[in-house]
Regions:
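A short beta-strand micro-motif
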Residues: 37-43
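A cross-kingdom marker for long, charged
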Residues: 214-226
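Short N-terminal segments immediately surrounding and downstream of signal-peptide cleavage
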Residues: 21-37
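Glycine-centered tight beta-turn/hairpin loop motif at sheet-sheet or coil-to-beta transitions
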Residues: 43-45, 67
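Bacterial Sec-dependent N-terminal signal peptides
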Residues: 1-23, 218
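Aromatic-patch recognition
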Residues: 52-181
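A short, solvent-exposed beta-edge/loop patch
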Residues: 155-210, 214-217
């Protein structure tokens, strides 16, 4: 319970810090307004410290080293702590842990909505190329982790010289290292979940799908069936 409360409070702190700073932009497609000191834990058990951030294109983990921004292969990463926030590798992407259950956890994902920027209706400037210093969206289509420059100081200096980057947010349940959207339909599709019994569980526990505390109860319920 203490661990759950800690994660919940940490999530609120992270949200507050982000809300008080500028939002991500086309030039600065990151979850945080700057790279933050953190610690990475590898799947094999090794650890390393550095300045990390999460790229909103693919949930990629980026690191500043010797003034240059690089991408870390998450295939070797188990989890990373950035400030007070914890991220876990699920299927090759980094997801923010919102709460942990007995044998699973609830995660959040924030993704850049690049399609909203390049719509033909003129929204968000209608074109990515102007903000990206000559890099056109077509040239980089599919490579959502690209940056205008990998030089940290240069990128930091121009991060507000482009339009705000729209984002979408999703919440998932992680059970047996598998990702399930946090909705009833997705949970009912999990092997071993009985529709009638699960519906009774939801009703008796007054489960609200938008409450992280309730989602942890669902995770614990599902893992208890294993």
């Amino acid at each position: 319970m203490k661990k759950l409360l800690f994660l919940f409070v940490s999530a609120l702190v992270g949200m507050t810090v982000f809300a008080q700073d500028e939002m991500p932009t086309v030039n600065w497609p990151y979850l945080y307004p700057d790279f933050i000191q953190g610690e990475l834990m590898q799947i094999g058990g090794g650890t390393s410290k550095g300045q990390y951030n999460i790229h909103l294109g693919q949930g990629a983990l980026h690191l500043v080293e010797n003034g240059q921004i690089g991408e870390i292969s998450v295939q070797t990463v188990m989890k990373v702590t950035i400030g007070e926030d914890i991220f876990r590798n699920v299927g090759g992407r980094m997801y923010k842990v919102l709460a942990e259950g007995k044998d699973g956890y609830v995660v959040g994902e924030t993704l850049a909505d690049y399609s909203a920027i390049v719509r033909d209706d003129g929204a968000y400037g209608g074109s990515l190329s102007n903000a990206a210093k000559g890099f056109s969206y077509d040239e980089n289509y599919g490579n959502y982790s690209y940056l205008v420059t990998n030089d940290y100081a240069d990128l930091l200096s121009i991060k507000n010289e482009s339009e705000e980057l729209p984002v979408t947010k999703n919440t998932y349940l992680v059970i047996d290292n598998q990702l399930y959207p946090a909705n009833k339909k997705s949970v009912l599709a999990i092997e071993g979940v009985d529709k009638k019994v699960f519906s009774e569980f939801l009703k008796s526990n007054d489960i609200k799908w938008k409450e992280v505390v309730d989602l942890v109860k669902i995770v614990d319920y599902i893992t208890s069936l294993k």
